[in-house]
Amino acid sequence: MNRRTFTKRTLLASSAFALPKFSIAKPGETKKINVAVVGVGGMGGYAVNEAANENLVAMCDVDDSRAANAFKKYPDVARFKDFRVMLDKMGKDIDAVSISTPDHTHFAAAMAAMERGKHVFVQKPLAHNIWQVRTLRKAAEHYKVITQMGNQGHTFPGMRRIKEWIDAGVVGDVREVITWTNRPNPPWFVPPSSFPPVSGAVPNTLDWDLWQGPVKHQDYSSDYVPVKWRGWWNYGCGSLGDIGCHTFDAPFWALGLGSPISVEVDRKEPPGKGFIPMGSVVTYKFPARGKKPPVTLKWYEKGYEVPKPKRWQKDKDLPSGGGMYMEGEKETLYHSGMRPNSPMITPGKRFMEMKSKLVKIPKLPSVGNGPIQEWYRAIKGDGPMPGSNFDYSAPLTEMVLLGAIAQRTGKNIEWDSKEMKIKGMPELDSLIKEPTNNGWEYGENLW
């Protein structure tokens, strides 16, 4: 590929960097955003601190214990347990809503905010089922709001280097991608001592009904909260939902993977107890995209041996914590960890040989200070549309959720993206669009 062709492709890839249409201020105008945060413990604490650099006007959490640090740090900020009440009472005072709740309430919180014209940030995965992620994408356009999903790695310089190297033809055609994680592991994924788990008294700091929200209500158990919900299909999306939006991000973006046509699974134990497998291998098949060849992407969880790249240092193990590599016709592109902190060409000796060539490749625009700040800049009109806006993050999350369906059922599936159906398995329709409790329905008007 010559420089002119690469520059043209880079400009096309950079089209997402145009200023958004729905900002609240003119470029350069000094304005602080009125931000409400839903879910202020855990990752929500990070969201609260980011919001405090703007105008933190409201905090919402169903658990006073989990929220205690944020409530203590910002005692004068309005507090709520129900985000619907918060939006009804303070809607006129809120510009944007940052959501860091468990997976099963992402959709309802985001839709309630967008219906009122609020810009939204949602932690990964974007939602709990495929109908929800597609509806969120529709809603972002319908309500003309600026959106962002919290996969931090999408803002990293390493993410841009991967995209640049792929577009420049350094790696060559890629037909195989290998990804892996050391999860499921404690404290997030801990099988209960019995199924169903032992119930107990609801802590007086927790509104258990509100915590469950849109899904079928069950007796309280400490095997669900505060962090173990990730392992239960009613509430979480397993290791894939936890890490997939991070580790799939680079190949999904750089290779333009789009929607898979099939997903296969090998799991350690049979399905049926409502809890995730404690290890699996998921294989995605993607069709050719224009001149790009078909791609097989494999996801390895804890307990499965990950194959080493063809081009790798002898006697060196892959890092156990996680990583990703793409096998190209020319080179192997690799990064360790769940996110692309320091991508490289392997083996290391080859990377050193290529460095002088790689530094000459034109650079994509950088993103500073993480995904929430990127979202704030777009809202203010001081920066482009966020890179993980719902047009991008909804299809990425859909890929993750298809793998979760295969894990959950133990079935290999063929996916009809256009019809939003798993071929020949109508019994799985209820996992594509899950039942919702009365009073928690959103988005039906967008279909």
Regions picked out by a protein language model, each given a short descriptive name:
Residues 119, 127-205:
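A contiguous active-site-proximal alpha/beta segment in oxidoreductase catalytic domains
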Residues 37, 99, 122, 128, ...:
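Hydrophobic residues in well-ordered beta-strands that form the structural core
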Residues 161, 173, 178-184, 188-391, ...:
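Contiguous beta-strand/loop segments that form the cofactor/metal-binding neighborhood of enzyme cores
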Residues 12-74, 153-156, 166, 251:
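N-terminal Rossmann-like dinucleotide-binding module
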Residues 31-33, 54-57, 75-76, 92-96, ...:
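Loop/turn elements at helix/coil->beta-strand transitions in domains of secreted/extracellular proteins
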